């Protein structure tokens, strides 16, 4: 830090220069985040200074969190479900493993996760000294239920299924995992950080929520397909009493106990998530998701017209193909197996899809000729 401060002109000239070094979403095809909706930005700015870590000081903001949780409870077919907002899927997954470990209360706990699980579970297990048992996926990149059953023992505290995998956009067989969880008396957590905003608005989507017996908790991220500001996550639980295992005393706050992982919790991102859902409604969300899925199908159709084959037909708006290079300035990613991965987020409009296909086609044809 310099002895003398900058003028606002100097400061923001520098900041704008740094921002200009960032990639533009107009060419980003790899991210599961997107440009937030204008109402999310407006709501975020309105609630910028609010802190839900001390909700008694911000009762209006706390009411928005309560309403958001009630909306997700209804969306996920369990009106009595409870929940709380988090910073995103990683925090939600950590919280689940915290209460699962405490509930099971064994010396050497383990969890069962698919090979497609998000890396946050590896982080969480390392933090809490939990063994992570990895289940292989089938040819459709879905968790093998039989293999999962073989790994369960008396120390298993949680089974994890994924709804909308990060790499291939697939959904694990949640009903089968629910039966397994009930049979073994183990908590089933569904990581729907991405798919939780997509699957409820699709016709004939694979079941993943509390309508499935055995599902105990669900993680979903408004800062992904919910068009909210970053960071924003929600953790839903079928039975809110599981949070009792996480309570700590907070004597100097307006509430005397808390179960959240973070102390300070931004009310701004909660207001942003609420604003988007209130503004779009179910019809608006369905239209948004439908558009993203149509663009995903167009992307697959266009790539296959060049002879680049899909790896799988996805459940959500993630398209994967055999390994090929992509021309600049397009930003894509590749799976652990080296497959090309493209996420058709709301900023990936039909015009963007067509522009990418045009650039790719020109580059690909010249490369193979």
From Swiss-Prot:
GO terms for biological process: carboxylic acid metabolic process; coenzyme A biosynthetic process; methanofuran biosynthetic process. SUPFAM superfamilies: PLP-dependent transferases. Pathway: Cofactor biosynthesis; methanofuran biosynthesis; Cofactor biosynthesis; coenzyme A biosynthesis. The keyword RNA-binding does not apply. This is Probable L-tyrosine/L-aspartate decarboxylase. It comes from Methanospirillum hungatei JF-1 (strain ATCC 27890 / DSM 864 / NBRC 100397 / JF-1). One of its GO terms (molecular function) is pyridoxal phosphate binding. Its EC number is 4.1.1.11, 4.1.1.25. The modification N6-(pyridoxal phosphate)lysine is found at residue 224. Gene3D superfamilies: Aspartate Aminotransferase, domain 1, Type I PLP-dependent aspartate aminotransferase-like (Major domain). Coiled coil: none annotated. Its cofactor is pyridoxal 5'-phosphate. Catalyzes the decarboxylation of L-tyrosine to produce tyramine for methanofuran biosynthesis. Can also catalyze the decarboxylation of L-aspartate to produce beta-alanine for coenzyme A (CoA) biosynthesis. It catalyses: L-tyrosine + H(+) = tyramine + CO2; L-aspartate + H(+) = beta-alanine + CO2. Keywords: Decarboxylase, Lyase, Pyridoxal phosphate. Belongs to the group II decarboxylase family. MfnA subfamily.
């Amino acid at each position: 830090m310099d002895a003398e401060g900058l003028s606002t002109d100097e400061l923001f000239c520098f900041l704008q220069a740094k921002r200009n070094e960032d990639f533009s979403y107009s060419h980003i095809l790899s991210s599961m985040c997107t440009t937030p909706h204008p109402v999310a930005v407006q709501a975020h700015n309105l609630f910028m200074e609010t802190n839900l870590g001390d909700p008694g000081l911000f009762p209006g903001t706390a009411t928005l969190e309560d309403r958001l949780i009630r909306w997700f409870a209804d969306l996920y077919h369990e009106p009595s479900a409870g929940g709380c907002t988090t910073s995103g899927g990683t925090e939600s997954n950590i919280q689940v493993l915290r209460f699962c470990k405490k509930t099971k209360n064994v010396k050497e706990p383990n969890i069962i996760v698919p090979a497609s699980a998000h890396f946050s579970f590896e982080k969480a297990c390392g933090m809490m000294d939990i063994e992570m048992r990895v289940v292989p996926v089938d040819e459709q990149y879905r968790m093998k239920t039989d293999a999962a059953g073989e790994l369960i023992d008396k120390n298993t505290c949680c089974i994890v299924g994924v709804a909308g995998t990060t790499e291939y956009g697939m959904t694990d067989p949640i009903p089968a995992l629910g039966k397994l969880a009930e049979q073994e008396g183990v908590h089933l957590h569904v990581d729907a950080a991405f798919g939780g905003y997509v699957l409820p608005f699709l016709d004939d989507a694979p079941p993943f929520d509390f309508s499935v017996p055995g599902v105990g908790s669900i993680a979903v991220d408004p800062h992904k397909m919910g068009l909210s500001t970053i960071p924003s996550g929600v953790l839903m639980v079928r039975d809110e009493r599981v949070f009792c295992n996480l309570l700590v005393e907070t004597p100097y706050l307006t509430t005397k106990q808390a179960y959240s992982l973070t102390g300070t919790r931004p009310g701004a991102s909660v207001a942003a998530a609420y604003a988007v859902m209130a503004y779009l409604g179910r019809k608006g969300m369905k239209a948004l998701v439908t558009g993203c899925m149509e663009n995903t199908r167009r992307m697959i159709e266009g790539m296959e017209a060049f002879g680049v084959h899909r790896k799988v037909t996805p459940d959500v708006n993630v398209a994967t193909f055999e390994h090929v290079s992509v021309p600049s300035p397009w930003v894509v990613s590749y799976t652990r197996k080296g497959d090309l991965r493209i996420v058709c987020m709301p900023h990936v409009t039909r015009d963007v899809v067509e522009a990418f296909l045009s650039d790719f086609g020109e580059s690909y044809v010249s490369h193979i000729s």
